Amino acid sequence: MGFKYLKIKNPKVILTEWIPFGKNYMTEFIDRITLKEYQRKRIKYFTASERRDIRYKAVFETSEYQTTVNIIEFIPETSVKFTAEIIGERKKDVFIYVDYLGRCIYSSEITKAGDEEEIVSLDNLSFVIPDLILDSSRIMSHLISPPQRYLLETLYGEIKVYKHVTVLTETVVNIDENTILEISQVIGAVKNIIEIDDGLIIFGDFGIFISHKNPEKFEKFIYYYPFIRSITGVSRDLFFKLNNIASKLEVISNTLASGVDLEDITEIRGELSRIDRELAVIEIVCGYLKEIVEFLNSSYPPNFGDFDLMILEKVEAERKLRRLIYRIAEIENILKSNDSLATSLTRLLTTISEDLERKIANQLAENTKYQVAIGEAMEVLEIGIFGVYALEAAHILLLTSGKDEILHHIKILGFPLEFWIILVVTILGVYVGKIVIEYRKKKVLGE
């Protein structure tokens, strides 16, 4: 950046993207932004501002700024056109068109960029476009339904930053090395240049730059062709997402093959759950894309004039649509493969988890038996100790009493009386020890 060779007069920036819609979502979307949904629910959904110009208009709060939506026209279940006023550092009016195919077009005339007005450099324009992309994403993220928002956030995160950029200007541009560098700032690396009716269409990685004395002539082309490129971009995103998922599944497969513990199983189960959700979203999005691509192919060429059809022929729109059919088929195959692998790994993980849990349960059972055996042995030992204490006590008592000689001469069943005294005391000590240990066990178990 830093070049300021090329300046253009009041450029129009048109952003095109695809959002999953369909006629049901389209009906709900139109009801929402025309306030019919809120009128049915008897909810007041108008601004409380005293400003007369916006007092009775729909105002949607998006993040740090408000958006005033003014409906231009709509066709039930099909399409809607409206403007959205973005109130922020730079107040901008954005024209928005949405139809049931999911074609979302945002258009804004840039009258000021940086310190320049009316005639602005592409260097300054390149700073305005990202703001417009983020603003339009915030608006649409707020207006679409939660299921649509979930699909987009699963694929792109909180904010979808990719949109196809078209820059339209009536300024005549002479192509040279410097102008190509400037133009690449707003549409990406220049890939192709087509001369059309004393004008230029310059194609970049992520956008188109159109220079023509009568730029309105390209309205239908801008309506049609950037949408094809947007769908192509979404298909590339699905490929990237599926390849990323395939890499994750490969890592999981290798991890399971090398052996896992319970902590690993919990982590892998969470990862497989996230992958399953992503695959479900990709399947839904792929279904939308398939219907759209089939419709565009079956209705080609569109009902345009000779000029627009000539441009579409030059850019090989029909061939690109046919190629999209094959790409969608490839996505379906990869999706099926990933889904099958994810299912197999989930089953394998369940089997490994059950085996590991069974081993742990068996080990715990063995440990429990071992602990019980040790406990029982300790009880016997403690009881025996009580008996030994009683034996020693009786023996000491007899020795200190001085009557052991007398008792020695008194015999019962051939054994001295002192033997029977020691035996009875020992048995009594063992019994007392057993009673004490049983009491302690009951007390501990009770606690």
Swiss-Prot record:
GO cellular component, one term: plasma membrane
Keywords: Cell membrane, Membrane, Transmembrane, Transmembrane helix
Places the protein is found: Cell membrane
Topology of this chain in the membrane: Multi-pass membrane protein
Membrane-spanning intervals of the chain: 380-400, 412-432
Principal subcellular localization: membrane
UniProt protein name: Uncharacterized protein MJ1566
Organism: Methanocaldococcus jannaschii (strain ATCC 43067 / DSM 2661 / JAL-1 / JCM 10045 / NBRC 100440) (Methanococcus jannaschii)
